[in-house]
Regions:
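Short beta-strand/turn micro-motifs at beta-sheet edges
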Residues: 1, 64-71
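N-terminal beta-strand motif that seeds the catalytic metal site of vicinal oxygen chelate
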Residues: 1-19, 81, 146-147, 151-170
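Short, flexible turn/loop "capping" segments at secondary-structure junctions
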Residues: 3-5, 71-76
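Vicinal oxygen chelate
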Residues: 15-19, 76, 81-137, 161-170
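Short glycine-/small-residue motifs
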Residues: 56, 139-140
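A short local loop/turn or secondary-structure capping micro-motif enriched for an aromatic residue
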Residues: 65-68, 100-102, 146-149
Length: 170
């Protein structure tokens, strides 16, 4: 058995323009600034939070001469960052908020799983995807299925459990 990790603590991103990214993450996603650290070379790190933890997201300006957008979104090391909202109502409000802010979706809204996109391995979550100013892929989701006992299901058992979830039996 490996390390007993409780949760992902935070995600740190290199950004091309701290002010632009800061506006996006505060005005569009609702982050709050915990603190900002400017370094003598002019680079900066900003700690952002969604709740009462010190930080959930860290924005760091790229070192001088580094273009964080040089690699396209598919070549980057972070595939996506997913943000959970409380429920379907919060999901729909988030969708409307992004639309009002002019953020274009790259996928969704959709439901992952047999009741939505047909994926037997899907989570049952409602999701939509969009990019931040540097092209990082972001997801907002709600209603992810929980896996009993934290164990992986065999595929057939998983499909049956998913159907039970869809039917409101789980």
């Amino acid at each position: 058995m490996g390390i007993q990790i409780k949760r992902i603590g935070h995600v740190g991103l290199l950004v091309s323009d701290v002010e632009c990214s800061l506006r996006f993450y505060t005005e569009v996603l609702g982050c709050k600034v915990t603190n900002r650290n400017k370094r003598p070379d002019g680079s900066e790190t900003v700690f952002l939070r969604f709740d009462d933890w010190h930080h959930d997201l860290v924005l760091s300006s790229a070192p001088p001469g580094v273009d964080v957008t040089a690699a396209g979104p598919r070549e980057r090391l972070i595939q996506q960052i997913a943000f959970e909202v409380e429920d379907r109502d919060a999901f729909l409000k988030a969708l409307a908020h992004l639309h009002a802010k002019g953020v274009k979706l790259i996928n969704g809204p959709l439901i992952h799983g047999i009741e939505g996109d047909g994926n037997l391995g899907g989570s049952g979550s409602r999701s939509f995807y969009f990019h931040d100013p540097d092209g990082n892929r972001l997801e907002t989701f709600a209603d992810m299925m929980r896996v009993p006992n934290g164990e992986e299901f065999p595929r057939q058992e998983y499909a049956e459990a998913m159907q039970a979830y869809v039917n409101g039996e789980r």
